[in-house]
Amino acid sequence: EKGKEILGKI
């Protein structure tokens, strides 16, 4: 899911 990409960004 996109959530993992967001978490990887921070």
Curated annotation (Swiss-Prot):
Q: Which GO terms describe its cellular component?
A: extracellular region
The answer to whether UniProt assigns keyword Iron to this entry is: no
Cite the entry's keywords alphabetically: Secreted, Toxin
Q: Which terms in the Gene Ontology molecular function aspect does this entry carry?
A: toxin activity
Where is the protein localized?
Secreted
| Entry annotated with the keyword Secreted | yes
Domain of life the protein comes from:
Eukaryota
Which tissues is it found in, per the record? Expressed by the venom gland.
Location, primary (coarse class): secreted
Q: What is this protein called?
A: Toxin To56
